[in-house]
Amino acid sequence: IANPTSNQTYTLTATDNSSGCTATDQVVVTVNITPPVAEAGNNFTIDCNQNSTGAGIGMSAVNGVTYSWSPTTGLTNGSISNPNAAPASTQTYTLTATNSLNGCVATDNVTVTVNTTAPTANAGTGFTKNCTSNTSGSQIGMATASGVNYAWSPSTGLNSTTVSNPTANPSVTTTYTLTATNQSNGCTASSLVVVNVDTQAPLANAGPDVEI
């Protein structure tokens, strides 16, 4: 059995024991066990700030090599060397490269992390400002969450537009929009609240002056 680790030429010599005559023959064993190169690419993150539509993974194709990816979830093509990856959740992809000439294979992995969790936005419960209740306005919004930025629009009648729970004291009925932004991934959520203003005084008419 011949099992060399590199190309070898073997020579067989046969000798006739009675005459001493010899004959030779050669056989060449070619060793072709070179694996292909598999490069799955660099890990990356999909969030609301970057790579929102995914990104390319893998490598440039090499002649004589076939490629397959597993899993194929979120890939534009699971049988090319460099598909676009846009999974809905975090995935680790395995690239298998196969040398078509010798069947040798190589593998490599790449992880696509998906971080698209939106924050919670709750603009609070609307209220009515009139001459007897909420005369100085009232608080709207929600408790502050760590790692979240807040922005209110419009700013009219608010004591702050960048806190989660400002006091609203508009002079006319106003619909406020709260936008919450996750600092870690740029994802946003929004919510509305209406503050009704009913401060129109009634008409008072005592009539003309009279002389008694």
PLM regions with names:
Residues 1-10, 79-93, 162-176:
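Solvent-exposed segments in extracellular or luminal domains encompassing
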Residues 18-24, 101-107, 184-190:
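Short, exposed coil/turn segments at beta-strand boundaries within extracellular/luminal domains
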Residues 27-33, 110-116, 193-199:
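Interdomain boundary/hinge segments at the C-termini of tandem beta-sandwich modules
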Residues 34-42, 117-125, 200-208:
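Proline-enriched interdomain boundary motifs that mark the N-terminal boundary
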Residues 44-53, 127-136, 210-212:
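Short, solvent-exposed loop/linker segments at the N-terminal edge
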Residues 50-62, 133-145:
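A short beta-strand segment in extracellular, disulfide-stabilized domains
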Residues 61-71, 145-154:
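Solvent-exposed loop segments of extracellular immunoglobulin-like
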